[in-house]
Amino acid sequence: MEKVLVFGHKNPDTDAICSAIAYAELKKELGMNAEPVRLGEISGETQFALDYFKVEGPRFVETVANEVDNVILVDHNERQQSANDIESVRVLEVIDHHRIANFETSDPIYYRCEPVGCTATILNKMYKENGVTIRKEVAGLMLSAIISDSLLFKSPTCTEQDVAAARELAEIADVDADNYGLEMLKAGADLSGKTMEQLISLDAKEFQMGNAKVEIAQVNAVDTNDVLVHQAELEKVISAVVEEKGLDLFLFVVTDILTNDSVGLAIGKAANVVEKAYNVPLENNTATLKGVVSRKKQIVPVLTEAFQA
């Protein structure tokens, strides 16, 4: 039987990794030869979850057409966020919870996108719809994905469906969601030992906003000053990325997991759009974004609207 690769976006977060594992397992249970893979490094937060539930992380690939003809995308759909040679393979399915952009296929596909906080929430439904029992370890990873994407249920992207799914999965995984979740988020917020290049690419996504090419990277921290003390070095590596990729804006967002506020560091010729979008002044290229924790709901649509205005 021909193999199908299942993967999330580049610079994968916990949902991208864990949903690839969970969905590949469901597809295998349903008779498909599916393998989860990843398009980037595993973050400290994700590694904490993998270690806790004793699951091996997916192998890394840069290209997919050299291995398979067919792939399944989870937690993304935009071409620039996917495998480098995504145009050379057939996308069979997409399971996602983001905006749909820069995506088209030559054949009809199974496309499931729901306005929930996490791909794993959708997968929880799909396991039940197909009558497949979720293994304890996989339930733990799916729970981890929801906790990560919802910032332990505090993000505005978090829905009642996400909370309900998390409670179900926590029971299967036999963990206390709140206690486990806080430990996992703290592990993800430990940025010690990271280079500046790693910091700006840990969770970075590229977007087309009107005619502008924008990259938004986000890291969680217990104290934003722990990251911003390196601002001069960060600006240097971000400026290099802006030049290399021809970006109009690179927005580096540092989110405080305790206060649920963020600080944005804006570099590029369109940095002023951040001021317009949030009605805040940039001082020394930074601005405090009160109550902003979600790239998907509070940054991407706000900036997109500002660029298109």
Curated annotation (Swiss-Prot):
SUPFAM superfamilies: DHH phosphoesterases
Entry's localization field: Cytoplasm
UniProt cofactor(s): Mn(2+)
Cofactor info, note text: Binds 2 manganese ions per subunit.
GO MF annotation list: inorganic diphosphate phosphatase activity; manganese ion binding
Entry binding sites for Mn(2+) 1: H9, D13, D75
Gene3D superfamilies, per database record: DHHA2 domain, inorganic pyrophosphatase (n-terminal core)
Keyword field contains Electron transport: no
Known catalytic reactions: diphosphate + H2O = 2 phosphate + H(+)
Binding positions (Mn(2+) 2): D15, D75, H97, D149
GO (cellular component) term, any one: cytoplasm
Xref: HAMAP family: PPase_C (MF_00207)
Entry-linked PANTHER family: BNIP - RELATED (PTHR12112), MANGANESE-DEPENDENT INORGANIC PYROPHOSPHATASE-RELATED (PTHR12112:SF22)
Similarity comment: family membership: Belongs to the PPase class C family.
Stated name of the protein: Probable manganese-dependent inorganic pyrophosphatase
Species assigned in the record: Bacillus cereus (strain 03BB102)
Source taxonomy: Bacteria, Bacillati, Bacillota, Bacilli, Bacillales
